[in-house]
């Protein structure tokens, strides 16, 4: 798919990267490890195609390890490879704009570009510009890799399957590693959040990624595929399910329940408009009866940490479940921040460094912090609202909403069985993340970001491949 001349240009970019890495190592010997991914890329390009490098990144992302230098860090080996591919994308976009023209015309791409532009604007006005521009750069290389390169590479639908197999097999390594560590501590629930380190930060992102891969893999088992492909997806599904169960993550368990209910509605041919209307009605009722709902929740004293059923019951316990109380503390602190800067927000990536001053002592818990070292807003929706204002929030809603609408349309009106299979698998997988995003946010971490942006790239490529592309989404 990629011409020899383009590969030669990537060689040049890679060699330049190698020289820059060597210069960095010469000045700062402790950063020697930075040279390794560039070497891997150059050697790989002499043996493989760009498509295979793409799959290597997918495979290595789940078990990549963060290497810190100063106040910054890179996940190795995947992020340096994504940076090189981002540079190549810029070169190709300038030299061969027609290659990406169909992708750039897609509605999902339009919303995504608006989102990136708004992140740039709010980085300029940020309360911590350096933090925000680091956030923007990391977002750019994951979006470029997963979405733009993905949309191009996934034009061959077989590459969707290859990508998910590569990522899933990489995730199996993490699950086996985590399960072995967990076994060593007697499968303790308290230790569950630590056993995947240093491959993943904690059990929340681990469970979110496992849920996404599980939903995709199980869907693939119910469609026609080659025997060995089904065996691979069966093994990946088994590993992912093990990861979800042993993570003791309430959000992950609920996200899988949610997609099961959604699948039933999908089989009943629910329209996208009906779905949006239903969600709108729920939100309105939530506002009208918020006091009654709060009083009901206030009576819940179910504690987490005993078993999965108890964990799920404890989700609405805002009295003595420390995790829930701390989440409310962060959300209320964030809401005070939003009221102060509703339009532009505090800047992308700044919440964890700024929210401490907006906490109230009576709402803080033993796990609260005032040092900006204990995570973010715990919501994929609330975070952008605080950091990029109301416009940033709406753009995230539009991006997620458009992807659901397109996938539902593809599922209801597929050009062939494979389109139906992939659209359903991607839809259910993304929905686990969108639901999980109500309580956590991971798009600033490569483990989830690569998977989410790649799946959105799959959405665009499937939509471009659809023969009846002019068919209106209003039919959904």
Across the structure, where does each feature detected by a protein language model lie?
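Alpha-helical transmembrane segments of multi-pass inner-membrane proteins
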Residues: 2-22, 37-44, 112-124, 141-146, ...
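Membrane-interface micro-motifs in multi-pass membrane enzymes
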Residues: 28-32, 73-81, 135-138, 199-210, ...
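N-terminal signal-anchor transmembrane segment
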Residues: 6-94, 121-125
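Aromatic-anchored transmembrane helix interface
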Residues: 78-83, 107-119, 129-152, 171
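Membrane-interfacial loop-to-transmembrane alpha-helix junctions, especially the N-terminal start
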Residues: 46-57, 101-113, 160-167, 232-233, ...
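Long extracytoplasmic/lumenal interhelical loops at the membrane interface
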Residues: 187-192, 317-332, 336, 340, ...
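A membrane-periplasm/extracellular boundary helix in multi-pass inner-membrane enzymes
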Residues: 4-6, 26, 182, 242, ...
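Membrane helix-loop boundary segments at the extracytoplasmic
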Residues: 59, 64-70, 381-388, 421-461
């Amino acid at each position: 798919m990629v011409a020899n001349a383009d590969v030669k240009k990537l060689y040049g970019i890679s060699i330049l990267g190698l020289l820059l890495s060597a210069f960095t190592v010469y000045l700062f010997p402790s950063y020697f490890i930075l040279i390794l991914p560039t070497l891997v890329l150059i050697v790989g390009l002499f043996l493989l195609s760009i498509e295979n490098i793409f799959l290597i990144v997918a495979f290595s992302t789940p078990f990549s390890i963060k290497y810190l230098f100063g106040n910054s860090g890179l996940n190795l080996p995947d992020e340096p490879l994504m940076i090189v591919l981002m540079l190549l994308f810029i070169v190709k976009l300038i030299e061969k704009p027609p290659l990406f023209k169909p992708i750039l015309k897609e509605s999902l791409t339009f919303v995504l570009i608006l989102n990136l532009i708004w992140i740039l604007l709010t980085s300029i006005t940020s309360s911590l510009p350096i933090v925000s521009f680091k956030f923007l750069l990391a977002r750019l290389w994951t979006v470029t890799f997963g979405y733009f390169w993905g949309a191009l590479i996934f034009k061959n639908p077989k590459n969707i399957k290859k990508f998910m197999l590569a990522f899933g097999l990489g995730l199996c390594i993490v699950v086996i590693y985590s399960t072995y560590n967990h076994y060593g501590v007697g499968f303790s629930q308290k230790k569950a959040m630590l056993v995947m380190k240093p491959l993943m930060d904690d059990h929340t992102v681990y469970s979110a990624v496992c849920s996404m891969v599980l939903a995709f893999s199980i869907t693939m088992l119910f469609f026609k595929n080659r025997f060995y492909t089904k065996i691979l997806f069966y093994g990946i599904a088994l590993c992912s399910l093990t990861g979800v169960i042993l993570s003791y993550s309430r959000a992950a368990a609920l996200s899988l329940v949610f997609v099961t209910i959604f699948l039933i509605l999908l089989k009943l041919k629910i329209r996208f408009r009906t779905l949006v209307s239903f969600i709108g009605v729920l939100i309105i009722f939530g506002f009208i009866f918020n006091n009654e709902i709060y009083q009901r929740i206030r009576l819940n004293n179910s504690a987490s940490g005993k078993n999965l059923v108890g964990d799920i019951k404890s989700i609405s316990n805002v009295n003595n479940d420390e995790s829930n109380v701390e989440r409310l503390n962060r959300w209320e602190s964030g809401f005070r921040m939003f009221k102060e800067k509703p339009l532009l927000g505090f800047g992308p990536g700044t919440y964890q460094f700024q929210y401490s001053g907006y906490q109230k002592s009576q709402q803080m818990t033993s796990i609260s912090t005032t040092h900006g070292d204990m995570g973010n807003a715990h919501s994929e929706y609330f975070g952008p609202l605080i950091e990029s204002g109301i416009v940033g929030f709406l753009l995230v809603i539009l991006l997620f909403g458009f992807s659901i609408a397109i996938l539902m349309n593809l599922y209801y009106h597929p050009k062939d069985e494979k389109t139906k299979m992939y659209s359903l698998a991607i839809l259910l997988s993304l929905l686990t993340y969108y639901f999980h995003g109500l309580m956590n946010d991971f798009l600033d971490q490569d483990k989830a970001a690569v998977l989410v942006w790649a799946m959105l790239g799959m959405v665009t490529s499937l939509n471009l491949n659809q023969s009846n592309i002019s068919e209106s989404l209003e039919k959904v």
